């Protein structure tokens, strides 16, 4: 696989070519994903739940993400590697720059931050200092205590309009990817069409430019429940490499997610 860049993803969006992405946390699985030409990987703070056994992502530290970013980069030298900025690691633009530098030095190509237009100054500062940003909207797991649980976001018109405005503001500030989690497919389509940057969805229908799954859900090994929008591709194929290949193929062909794995 050739070295992936954000320019490749922008070109794919312009061409209407959909792409699959996954979380990854270690070198072995990163190598597996690269062998199947997975273009983008995310070292997600979901590791707090799937690796550390926590109930949410809040206990994850910057050092945790740095460690796993190094591991994933060792296994996948050519993917576009995103790294999550954990809870309260970007409360101010200055703090965000300090912590993002650690992730970039560990091998990340981009950092992912959760939140709306209050992040505009942070995104601007990061971008001006050569740190690419993925902006995460919708169900942002670090805000679980504000939301009162893991709930679908953007169902009413006012909140949907606000999310569109946030997406545009973050793109204007310099965000190069927007990730939408657990939003109605109609809203995801609206945001995908209005933005010039690639939009990655999870639980947001199949109209986004890309899809992402938590690795453990893809292989059916999550200790907790399986979200409606996830699919166990290993059960269908019986082989991890084939499962990854099937996921990539189904996303590229618009087969996944289907209605059964889409939030109305």
From Swiss-Prot:
3-methyl-2-oxobutanoate binds at residues 45-46, 84, 112. It catalyses: 3-methyl-2-oxobutanoate + (6R)-5,10-methylene-5,6,7,8-tetrahydrofolate + H2O = 2-dehydropantoate + (6S)-5,6,7,8-tetrahydrofolate. One of its GO terms (cellular component) is cytoplasm. Binds 1 Mg(2+) ion per subunit. GO terms for biological process: pantothenate biosynthetic process. InterPro entries: Pantoate_hydroxy_MeTrfase, Pyrv/PenolPyrv_kinase-like_dom, Pyrv_kinase-like_dom_sf. Keywords: Cytoplasm, Magnesium, Metal-binding, Pantothenate biosynthesis, Transferase. CDD domains: KPHMT-like. Coiled coil: none annotated. It is found in: Cytoplasm. GO terms for molecular function: 3-methyl-2-oxobutanoate hydroxymethyltransferase activity; magnesium ion binding. It comes from the Bacteria. Signal peptide: none annotated. Pathway: Cofactor biosynthesis; (R)-pantothenate biosynthesis; (R)-pantoate from 3-methyl-2-oxobutanoate: step 1/2. Its EC number is 2.1.2.11. The keyword Cytoplasm applies. Belongs to the PanB family. Homodecamer; pentamer of dimers. HAMAP family: PanB. This is 3-methyl-2-oxobutanoate hydroxymethyltransferase. It comes from Vibrio parahaemolyticus serotype O3:K6 (strain RIMD 2210633). The lineage of its organism: Bacteria, Pseudomonadati, Pseudomonadota, Gammaproteobacteria, Vibrionales. The gene is panB.
